Amino acid sequence: MYYLKNTNFWMFGFFFFFYFFIMGAYFPFFPIWLHEVNHISKGDTGIIFACISLFSLLFQPIFGLLSDKLGLRKHLLWVITGMLVMFAPFFIYVFGPLLQVNILLGSIVGGIYLGFIYNAGAPAIEAYIEKASRRSNFEFGRARMFGCVGWALCASIAGIMFTINNQFVFWLGSGCAVILALLLLFSKTDVPSSAKVADAVGANNSAFSLKLALELFKQPKLWLISLYVVGVSCTYDVFDQQFANFFTSFFATGEQGTRVFGYVTTMGELLNASIMFFAPLIVNRIGGKNALLLAGTIMSVRIIGSHSHTALEVVILKTLHMFEIPFLIVGCFKYITSQFEVRFSATIYLVCFCFFKQLAMIFMSVLAGKMYESIGFQGAYLVLGIIRVSFTLISVFTLSGPGPFSLLRRRESVAL
């Protein structure tokens, strides 16, 4: 009943919905758009993704520091929203034609735009709304659930629209960006509050200091969580980059594969949303560290399992996505707020969970692209899966806070 009356919960919930609706028009079908519409090779696709990662590196630490400096002011979100309105014109009239003229130039321009609005923009939005959730007393994970639903609905719609005319998908994204602007306009985060609450969310500018933020890098636990991100989260993102092309290869035609991919993505994201609703309760019970380890375990199963040979197996493995993302996202913020000062939450999130991941992806994307061409998707996925399992096991001992062994001991003591 409380959530029904919490205006900011609905405003930011629907902001997540439409933002990830736009992302759903881009991310799942981007490899297909590159390969089937623009006839880009697997190797060149790796270069494009590497450029996106490169420019994301420039924006993510800046966005992190800027987000903590701005607190709950919406300046950065306005810039991201304005660029999203240009989603369709950019893809249709700028990015696509440039890729045909010069692959490197197109990759650089695309990397700047996509790195800004998605790879750096998405975590900046998540970090902002996580701060707003603490100010407005609602669970971040439940607001983030709207994003899963938005992605799911768009994936199904875009899967159909893409096979009719791929440009329809991009115009749909630009239209949704206009709705984002309206939601941002009417959301209210600057209401009067006590200094205690403002400090808790890092809303006071005096609570933020660049010098203190840089002091974070002297803490070993920051580097250890970064090790988890590079070895676990980064490996998964590299795996997912060209998974759509691997998925469609199991079907008679590319159009059939694209449609089925859209349906499966929709089903997975709707299930993802249902898990996301309960994720805060589970993560609060098991702790941030265990949530991250659980996400790593599920992702490892999916990657290694993709060394499969039938469409049914690939469909089943695709739906595992519904479990991994809720525990990764909610778990990472739980870990950050329990192990570090909350006034630096955005900086830590965008540097550790985003910047270091993108840094590793510059090299891993190119390496994965070469593996896809030399040993095929299945062989490459087996290699990525082994890397993932190794780093998940290492993280059991390197991440701070109560781990799985502490959880087992606690259960045994309760049983006694």
Swiss-Prot record:
GO terms for molecular function: lactose binding; lactose:proton symporter activity. InterPro entries: LacY/RafB_perm_fam, LacY/RafB_perm_fam_CS, MFS_dom, MFS_trans_sf. Responsible for transport of beta-galactosides into the cell, with the concomitant import of a proton (symport system). PANTHER family: 3-PHENYLPROPIONIC ACID TRANSPORTER-RELATED, BLL5896 PROTEIN. This is Lactose permease. The gene is lacY. It catalyses: lactose(in) + H(+)(in) = lactose(out) + H(+)(out). The record marks 126, 144 as: Substrate binding.
